[in-house]
Swiss-Prot record:
This is Sorting nexin-21. GO terms for biological process: protein transport. It is found in: Cytoplasmic vesicle membrane; Early endosome membrane. It comes from Homo sapiens (Human). Highly expressed in fetus liver, but only weakly expressed in brain, skeleton muscle, smooth muscle, and cardiac muscle, kidney, and adrenal gland. Its main location: membrane. Belongs to the sorting nexin family. Monomer. Binds to membranes enriched in phosphatidylinositol 3-phosphate (PtdIns(P3)) and phosphatidylinositol 4,5-bisphosphate. May be involved in several stages of intracellular trafficking. Residues 129-246 form the PX domain.
């Protein structure tokens, strides 16, 4: 009887540990040292990693989640210990019922069934608690007189497992500039973070590209693991600023469909990264989305973007984008036959107070004039 109680307690403890490990905030994490947590492996790869990673650079994104990570990472092997138990013993449920096991096996079978049930439920409900980065393609670009490798990374954040990840495309010099700027500002935290060295030769071989791809994934993951670095303006700029500039350029030249995809990607990046610097970039992104949706004859989506922007603005009556968003919301609501009285009254109050001209500048005008830096 005492033995059965011990096994039941062990099953309960292990199930509790698994539940917290999958959620990403349990005692298993707390027990690990901060350094091991943040920097599980070096960014400089061993030779035998190149072949495995090369197979991942096929352009097809392989989704992983916090509870099902089988990317052949070294840290997985290191973390595996005596507490890991198989989910079954190779015996089917029917055979187990026909041949009752000895008393000593009841605890392990009960644990296996509990783990299997929890596994099935959690696969569809749990999402990664941190941003994950995966190089999905690496292409050699020849732009005479220069030649470089363009790395495309998927940025996978918390959310539904089937959510399409945001993407960025950067070259080695972009990563190097980010590393140099952060080193200058954060000497202490950056001292523990490795970065792939520059090479004079063999920069375009499959092996070098594979090594750097893996190193860039780890480099960004390490930066995200340190709060002081995660919120650094240079890191925010690295992810978002090139997307915003390209989207703005396409919008100004009338390529609205192409611009819309970039604005949407920039919005998703900002939602995943957070915006500690303030709402200006998200507001500019919503302005770009609203303009493109409107030009592509989708007033419903354009109005939804305006509503989201007005929620972000709150009662900031002096913000230069408030009146343009109100004016666009009034016009789109009238077009769709929806209530526009609140926005209309608010816009009129701004005009009577002399806080905005009549009529206010359009979102498109402000978007064209905005200098992104």
């Amino acid at each position: 009887m005492h033995r059965g109680t011990q096994e039941g307690a062990m099953a309960s403890r292990l199930l509790h540990r698994l539940r917290h490990a999958l959620a990403g905030d349990g005692p298993g994490e707390a027990a690990a040292s901060p350094e091991a947590e943040q920097f599980p492996e070096s960014s400089e790869l061993e030779d035998d990693d190149a072949e495995g990673l090369s197979s991942r650079l096929s352009g097809t994104l392989s989704f992983t989640s916090a509870e099902d990570d089988e990317d052949d990472e070294d840290e997985d092997d290191e973390e595996a210990g005596p507490d890991q138990l198989p989910l079954g013993d190779g015996t089917s449920g029917e055979d187990a019922e026909r041949s009752p096991p000895p008393d000593g096996q009841w605890g392990s079978q009960l644990l296996a069934r509990q783990l299997q049930d929890f596994w099935k439920k959690s696969r569809n409900t749990l999402a990664p608690q941190r941003l994950l980065f995966e190089v999905t393609s690496a292409n050699v670009v020849k732009d005479p007189p220069s030649k470089y490798v363009l790395y495309t990374l998927a940025v996978i954040g918390p959310g539904p497992p089937d959510c399409q990840p945001a993407q960025i495309s950067r070259r080695y010099s972009d990563f190097e500039r980010l590393h140099r700027n952060l080193q200058r500002q954060f000497r202490g935290p950056m001292a523990a973070i490795s970065f792939p060295r520059k090479r004079l030769r063999r920069n375009f071989t499959a092996e070098t590209i594979a090594r750097r791809s893996r190193a860039f994934e780890q480099f960004l993951g390490h930066l995200q693991a340190v709060p002081e670095l995660r919120h650094a303006p240079d890191l925010q700029d690295f992810f978002v600023l090139p997307e915003l500039r390209r989207a703005q350029s396409l919008t100004c030249t009338g390529l609205y469909r192409e611009a819309l995809a970039l604005w949407a990607n920039a919005w998703q990046l900002q939602a995943q990264l957070g915006t500690p610097s303030g709402p200006d970039r998200p507001l500019l992104t919503l302005a770009g989305l609203a303009v493109c949706h409107q030009e592509l004859e989708d007033p419903g989506e354009a109005r939804a973007c305006c509503e989201k922007a007005l929620q972000l603005l709150g009662d900031k009556s002096l913000h230069p984008l408030l009146a343009p968003f109100l004016e666009a919301h009034v016009r789109l609501s009238w077009r769709l036959g929806l209530d526009k009285r609140q926005s209309e009254a608010r816009l009129q109050a701004l005009q009577e107070a002399g806080l905005t001209p009549t009529p206010p500048p359009s979102l498109k005008e402000l978007l064209i004039k905005e200098v992104l830096d």
